[in-house]
Amino acid sequence: MSEKKYTFETEVDKLLHLVIHSLYSNREIFLRELVSNSSDAIEKLRYESISNAALNEDDTDYAIRIDFDKDAKTITVSDNGIGMTEEEVIENLGTIAKSGTKKFLESLTGDKSKDNELIGQFGVGFYSSFIVADKVTVRTRKAGQDKSQATKWVSDAQNGFTVETITKEKRGTEVILHIKKEHLDLLEYHVLKGLVNKYSDCINTSIQMKKVEYDKDGKQTVKDEYETVNNTKAIWLRSKDEVTDEEYQEFYKYISHDFADALMWIHNKVEGNLEYNSLLYIPQNKPFDFWNRDKDYGLSLYVRRVFIMENKELLPPYLRFVKGVIDSADLPLNVSREILQHNKVIDKIKKAITTKILSELKKLASKDKEKYQKFWDSFGQVLKEGVSDDYSNKEKIAGLLRFATTQSGDSKQTVSLADYISRMKEGQDTIYYITSDSYKAAANNPQLEAFKKKGIEVILMTDRIDEWMMSTLTEFDGKHMKSIIKGDIDLDRFETPENKEKFEKEAKDFEKVLKEIKEVLKDKVEDVRLSKRLTDSPSCVVVNDYGMSLHMQKMMEEAGQSFMPGMGMKPILELNAEHNLVQKLKNEADTEIFADLSELLLLQAMFVEGAKIEDPMAFVKLVNKYIR
């Protein structure tokens, strides 16, 4: 059959250009990526042949072979895995199905060191072949397909690709790389074997190369017999003392396609009523598309060394950054994704590894604060999801949280709740916090004034998830969690008798004027009262203890969510009795000026709080009216 010519989709063209011109210094990854693809193809066949043994075509000696030909200047990576149909070849090699590709390409900066890190987080897979090859040929036949229905794919990465139907005796895929002249040094046994041992030694499939013998003069002879050149015992089944740190790191890079080392790993063997082996990794950095909700995540599930699937059910969503494998002997080989969603063994494994991960993070936080801080900076926001999502582990997760505070000095989130408690003032039984859009907005919020004056530390929460998190985190270690922008603030125990008496006197003096202000603002506020929060600013707005904060209301509106009846409550206006503007208002006889100043005190408090101003122009006109 004659060949058909195709063009690459736009994203592939861009990615190919990027790979060829930006990754030349990381050329070694091509073999890791091709071996990884072959391994995946074999694992798919292993799994599918459980229910359809005919797919094996009487060949169950699964292997990946690496050959090189100095005369032809080629390297060939072949496997006897599942193979591909013509449609799959066009889809897998001519388009990029991976979501987030466009965003990834747009995020590149032009700085090669930064871009290489991004590329590593993205994973370039098959296209890394073009780092070392100026032409790539793929010959493949799907398992179970007729020998005459195989497919050949050819591309030079410049002019699209061609596809034609060919005959191929054996199922599986072979990738033939026509090596560029500047990379001909790769055409050596010791070089290719070295790359296998460096990047793919722990792969769960035999990687084979033709035997090489040397005579007494060091002359090399390549035999026709193949030998296994990797350690085929799965790394997660080996004991910890058999595995070097380098092997752990290379296996992480193999399964994650990350260029950077893992931050830490957890290697565990569980025996008893439930038996499984696990090797879990926590990366150093979050991938560029980490917040993409459509992105797949999950651990690789094996049953007795047979890869089953990437499975989300093995991890709670708030631990989706964890990479690794679980190998269980307590599941059937023909288990389906639907069965896994309601499987008691999976539920038990999930519970156990969740507990283990949280325990290891606690140890890390205690033993290596700098390393834990790196983890927190990358994954702290997603870990916070667990406070609301995982009630049984809420206290453990809360102990891992880190925050900026009024005493930490900057926006870096370094303070734990235990740290906060250890610094509480004598007589303090409440953990105080404030939520806001940004660190500066939180740190400069007028409602902190009384706390700062009394030396009471306040946690500054500025992540979008914090409001949701704090709706369920109401106490920690027996201490009540209190938002300083909700309800009354009782700081009387830290006040002198003189100040208490002074406030009571002011409350009586202002009783009449507060009622008058409330009447003026009756459609806009729930109440007007004197503030125990303010020392320098004239006014602030709060909500009652059970109301939705103005910050939360704003976020919901921005997300296009409507309020249920009673949710979007009117604020409470608090006034500083000692401020000149409030004193002026108290003594103002002109009803128009009185109304204007009342409105102004409310609007500026709303503005500082970041709340929505319904009519910004009216606010500006009001300010301009009283500028002297």
From Swiss-Prot:
Q: Which GO terms describe its molecular function?
A: ATP binding; ATP hydrolysis activity; ATP-dependent protein folding chaperone; unfolded protein binding
Q: Where in the cell is it found?
A: Cytoplasm
Q: Which UniProt keywords apply?
A: ATP-binding, Chaperone, Cytoplasm, Nucleotide-binding, Stress response
Region feature A, mapped onto this chain: 1-337
Coiled coil ranges = none
SUPFAM superfamilies per UniProt: ATPase domain of HSP90 chaperone/DNA topoisomerase II/histidine kinase, HSP90 C-terminal domain, Ribosomal protein S5 domain 2-like
Question: Where are the stretches annotated C?
Answer: 555-628
Q: Where is this region: B?
A: 338-554
Q: Which CDD domains match?
A: HATPase_Hsp90-like
| Main localisation | cytoplasm
One Pfam family matching this protein: HSP90
Q: Which GO terms describe its cellular component?
A: cytoplasm
Question: PANTHER family recorded for this chain?
Answer: HEAT SHOCK PROTEIN 90 FAMILY MEMBER
Q: What does this protein do?
A: Molecular chaperone. Has ATPase activity.
Q: Tell me its family.
A: Belongs to the heat shock protein 90 family.
Quaternary form?
Answer: Homodimer.
* Protein name, per record: Chaperone protein HtpG
